[in-house]
Amino acid sequence: MVQSAPSTEAIQLPKTSESAQLKRIRHTMSHVMAMAVQKLFPKAQVTIGPWTETGFYYDFDTPEPFTEADLKAIKKEMVKIIQQKLPVVREEVSREEAQQRIEALGEPYKLEILQGLTEPITLYHLGDRWWDLCAGPHVETTAELNPKAFDLESVAGAYWRGDETKAQLQRIYGTAWETPEQLTEYKRRKEEALKRDHRKLGRELGLFLFADPVGPGLPLWTPKGTILRSTLEDFLKQEQMKRGYQSVVTPHLARVDLFKVSGHWQNYREDMFPMMAEDDEARGLEQGFVLKPMNCPFHIQIYKNELRSYRELPIRLAEFGTVYRYEQSGELGGLTRVRGFTVDDSHLFVRPDQLASEFLSVVDLILSVFKALNLKKFKARLSFRDPESDKYIGSDDVWEKAESAIQAAAETLGMDYFIGVGEAAFYGPKLDFIFQDALDREWQLGTVQVDYNLPERFDLEYVAEDGSRQRPVMIHRAPFGSLERLIGILIEEYAGDFPLWLAPEQIRLLPVTETVLDYCQQVADQLRAIGVRVQVDCSGDRLGKLIRNAEKAKIPVMAVIGAQEAESETLSIRTRATGDLGSLTVADLTKRLSSAIAEKLPHL
């Protein structure tokens, strides 16, 4: 049965970014923790300690790693500091004054941070015994911190400045709330999240794995996991075919020059794997190959292979293309953050007069995908550029045109949306779908982008009705986003209980005795003939264990087969969702399974 987290509408858990007071509380808590650590561990050097969406952390350089016992002692010391009701005082100083004070404390990391700051330099004091180089904001006194509404959660390794070549630090994570009730609810949700963790369930259900000889962030898919992937791919391919998409296949790598034209090499290089070159000279001239971080330049080459007529447009090219991003090892997380992943990528080449209708059609496709997957809680983010940043390519006019097109489409659809400044891709704005899961965590899934820049950079053209050469507009879209991330989210959303149409194993036949094995195989052959994914449990275990094993494997449908069923050519059907369905003939079961799977019903 698909499980949902219990309703907790009475207790709200706002994000830090949604609450100015939580931002102050959590930021100050990181300082309180650093003060406690340096009192208990005088050799610990401080680095940075920001707030996060659910709490805070602080990175320390220490001779020895922190233990669980250390965390308990640190928390106890933090309670003492809070109960002293210390004033939190902001002080402005000159660079020279800040440098002198930091050098006197012997804090090299703070000295490095200071070098990147402009005056005035601000310090925050906890009473008169501890201070930190910080821009704030903070509470006015530790009396605003509730000693019963925080906890220290874990210790992890981290690199200074996120650079693997620099010092390894100890990061202590904590959480802090305004009330003890919020802390209790947060812990409940976290415990539920651990039960649903896709890394845990993926291992238990035998869907995917990671292997050290292969490397971090590179998942290996088992036969069951591959069925899950293929089912999702086939579903989307069928939906795309109905809408006039054409499938293409492109290589996993290309010459650096391709990505120089697209702008990826200049604007996205830090996220790409290093260049592969034949020798040092070629490397110096940047004449090598790189693994692709995106599929769009390849699809552009297919479009550009021949001169297009206005009558051919829109051209919709689609590919499940594997791309590669050089994520830092500390940023990797199961399937939701990997180094090699498959994007359900498509690029539409349209005339300007087709842009609005094609954009709306893409959104309709994404919404239909969400409906089939029973993903109901999501919101739309219009991801626009930050006009103060220089990381984007293209003119202001082009950006304004693209952003206006996306906003107009969202308003035409009557969508509730919010604008995310600075969330755009470097080449164009996006409409991103942010999904909220059963535990109120947010994930970006589908995305649609309007792009006037890459057609310009690659000099794309089509012959207009009057014979002139015109520039097409590109739409980038991916309903799933990343197939790996989607599967990770679905595992957690369904708690491993996949709907019938998506389950890697849809029905398991449970023979009570060996004498009915031949009949079981006959039934299995009939079900496979209509495309049902079926297995026969030939372990010889007793019926109770057969059922428990099927339940543990979260098989949607079980068919118990004994001598009576074999003689009458029937099956005794049980489902995880509705329990005992009684006796069915093979023909009845076949009909019901076919109908439920075709209609993508959650269960039989």
From Swiss-Prot:
Instruction: Name the segments for region: Catalytic.
Output: 197-499
> Domain of life here?
Bacteria
Enumerate the CDD domains for this protein: ThrRS_anticodon (cd00860), ThrRS_core (cd00771)
Q: Name one GO biological process term.
A: threonyl-tRNA aminoacylation
Q: Name one GO cellular component term.
A: cytoplasm
Keywords in UniProt for this one? Answer: Aminoacyl-tRNA synthetase, ATP-binding, Cytoplasm, Ligase, Metal-binding, Nucleotide-binding, Protein biosynthesis, RNA-binding, tRNA-binding, Zinc
Task: List the GO molecular function terms.
Answer: ATP binding; metal ion binding; threonine-tRNA ligase activity; tRNA binding
How many and how are cofactors bound here? Binds 1 zinc ion per subunit.
Where found, per UniProt? Cytoplasm
Into which EC class is this enzyme placed? ligase
Q: What is its EC number?
A: 6.1.1.3
For Zn(2+), which residues are the binding ones? 296, 347, 476
> Needs which cofactor?
Zn(2+)
Q: Which reaction does it catalyse?
A: tRNA(Thr) + L-threonine + ATP = L-threonyl-tRNA(Thr) + AMP + diphosphate + H(+)
- One of this protein's Pfam families, by short name? HGTP_anticodon
What job does this protein perform? Catalyzes the attachment of threonine to tRNA(Thr) in a two-step reaction: L-threonine is first activated by ATP to form Thr-AMP and then transferred to the acceptor end of tRNA(Thr). Also edits incorrectly charged L-seryl-tRNA(Thr).
Family membership, please give it.
Answer: Belongs to the class-II aminoacyl-tRNA synthetase family.
- Subunit structure, interactors included: Homodimer.
Recorded protein name is: Threonine--tRNA ligase
What would be the name of the gene that encodes this protein? Answer: thrS
